[in-house]
């Protein structure tokens, strides 16, 4: 999450609520609020997380269910950086200039 804004907008996407499991050895990196006004839980739900499995590293995201979500620069960036970290233990990729802000979604069409 280094270099990413603390708050940023993601394109319209499906929000998973009340994920199952004990969440052992899991670190939540980012959450999204599940608003009661949208029939949500009223809680912040995990969106990006890392887990360990033995000596392995796992990056997990609940984002990316359709074309608008997959086109979001926030999804693209966190997915690329998360998989790089899982594979190497390091993140070398820079945060792009068009990363979303707290008020604006940023998408790529190509």
Which residues make up each language-model segment?
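Catalytic beta-strand/loop cores that center a nucleophilic Ser/Cys/Thr
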Residues: 1-54, 95-96
